[in-house]
Amino acid sequence: MAGMLYLVPTPIGNLGDISQRCRETLENADFIAAEDTRVSLKLLNHLGIKKSLVSYYEHNKAFKGEKIVERILAGETCALVSDAGSPAISDPGEDLVKLWHEAGIVVCAIPGPCAVITALSISGQATGRFCFEGFLSTAKKSRREHLESLTNEQRTMIFYEAPHKLVATLQDMAAVFGEDRPISLCRELTKLHEEVVRTTLGSAIEKYTENAPKGEFVLVVAGAPEQEKEVATADDAAARVQQLMEEGLSRKDAIKQTAKELNLPKNVVYDAALQ
């Protein structure tokens, strides 16, 4: 009988944030798959848990993933952890979860710490609709292309960023979204020096150019403001009907097409065309 996979979230800073259920799952698992076994070992030592650790990270996932699946299909239970937060979220565990589903293995996700949600809740930005964009590319061209694809995104956008890339990322964001776009920079969440700076992209660039950023950041960027739709006038309708008729359409067809294009009632377009 096949075993199970448990996705076990780990603290994003404060070790006191690990739940009793997570602790029990780690204790009862046959082995633990970890992104960095050195980081996970520190947590296990803190919890007083001795367990077999298997490394699973970006550069060995193709080989190790199959081996882990084989062990679970043979009846063992695996707990998957990342260095911090919920596994499989912007992390190599994503591919491992896909493998397990393809193999028909039962997957159980345990709720717990997640930097995305923690940052969003404390950001002061709109929380009703949001999108998580993960880490931006280290290559400027790819980073700009990613941001440009979000030019008209109206949902709140969330990104992870390292301190050494922060200023370059903020500069690209300002170039694409505008310097006045609101942003909340959430740093060292749940740790001793936790900080949330709610400002604009332009002001953030000034702040972190003068003061070198430290710690890991979650950037919560306000979405694009909703654009006001222009309402077509009777003159617009009359001009468009005339143009379409000059192109060969009958008056009836020109009125019908104009009404559709300008989102106006046919009778309004008809009256405008007769003026």
Which role does the model predict for each range below?
Residues 3-5, 75-79, 155-156:
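Loop/turn-to-beta-strand initiation segments
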Residues 34, 109-112, 159, 185:
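General beta-strand structural signal in soluble alpha/beta enzymes
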Residues 2, 156, 163-275:
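A contiguous loop/helix-start segment that scaffolds small-molecule binding in enzyme catalytic cores
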Residues 1-58:
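Glycine-rich, flexible N-terminal cofactor/catalytic loop recognition
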Residues 95-153:
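Class I SAM-dependent methyltransferase SAM-binding "motif I" and its flanking Rossmann-like core
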Residues 92-94, 251:
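Glycine-centered tight-turn and secondary-structure capping sites
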Residues 26-32, 104-108, 156-157:
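Short active-site oxyanion
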Residues 55-63, 136-140:
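Conserved helicase motor
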